[in-house]
């Protein structure tokens, strides 16, 4: 998966930093420099249905449970953009109803905004139903595909902007306003389609690999359990 992510990053840089794919296009001046004509900048928040975060159940007098609805924390998200399900906590349905504002849906992007900043993952059907705490932002797109935005994050488009706008308190954190204010360079529709034809199969392959690694890990755990119980 490192190779797949590296390939996505290379394609992203070629398109959005070097403009190799549109080298012959006419360029116009924007507030962030020269960009191809018909491309435009939009704020991340304007491309999303919602950008929100969660709450720790104990602040509502509720507690974690041994099983139930997945509760994602910052440490549940790996550096390679997969989920570490062993690090999920769990809540019951009553607590999830109290925290319905921060329910996570399939194809949301989760992004750490406190503690270790900037880890992110794209949610698939194996993760939901799920909820999260205040250290994790939920980014739900509407005017850009989740896979396309995910590729921007893999391409590290957000890194410098978020680094400059990190709030230093007891621990470093990013506000939801900062998350929403990230300028996103959007190609015209035809260019978007061409770009996604290149990166979407790679993202799909990454997600397939994540699922396969998880399946093999579960199989290994089952075998180890059987071995230990047969002694």
Stretch-by-stretch model annotation:
Residues 1-55, 181, 185, 189-231:
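Non-catalytic DNA-recognition/assembly elements of restriction-modification systems
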Residues 9, 13, 17, 46-49, ...:
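Generic alpha-helical structural context detector
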Residues 27-28, 45-62, 75-106, 126, ...:
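Sequence-specific dsDNA recognition surfaces
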Residues 64-65, 218:
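A glycine-rich phosphate-binding loop feature that marks nucleotide/adenosyl-phosphate handling sites
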Residues 73-74, 93-158, 165-171, 175-179:
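A short beta-sheet element
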Residues 156, 161, 202-205:
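C-terminal structured domain segments across diverse proteins
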């Amino acid at each position: 998966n490192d190779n797949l992510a590296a390939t996505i990053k290379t394609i992203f840089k070629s398109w959005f930093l070097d403009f190799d794919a549109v080298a012959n296009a006419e360029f116009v001046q924007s507030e962030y420099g020269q960009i191809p004509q018909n491309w435009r900048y939009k704020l991340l928040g304007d491309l999303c249905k919602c950008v929100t975060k969660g709450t720790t159940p104990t602040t509502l007098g509720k507690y974690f449970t041994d099983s139930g609805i997945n509760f994602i924390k910052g440490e549940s998200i790996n550096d390679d953009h997969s989920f570490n399900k062993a690090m999920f906590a769990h809540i019951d349905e009553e607590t999830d109803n109290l925290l319905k504002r921060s329910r996570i849906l399939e194809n949301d992007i989760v992004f750490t905004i406190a503690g270790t900043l900037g880890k992110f993952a794209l949610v698939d059907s194996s993760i939901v139903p799920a909820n999260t705490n205040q250290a994790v932002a939920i980014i739900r797109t509407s005017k850009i595909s989740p896979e396309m935005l995910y590729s921007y994050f893999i391409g590290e488009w957000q890194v410098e902007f978020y680094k400059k706008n990190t709030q230093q308190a007891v621990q470093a954190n990013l506000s939801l306003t900062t998350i929403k204010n990230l300028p996103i360079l959007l190609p015209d529709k035809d260019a978007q389609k061409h770009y996604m034809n290149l990166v979407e199969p790679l993202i799909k392959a990454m997600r397939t690999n994540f699922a396969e690694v998880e399946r093999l890990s579960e199989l290994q755990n089952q075998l180890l359990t059987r071995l230990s119980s047969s002694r």
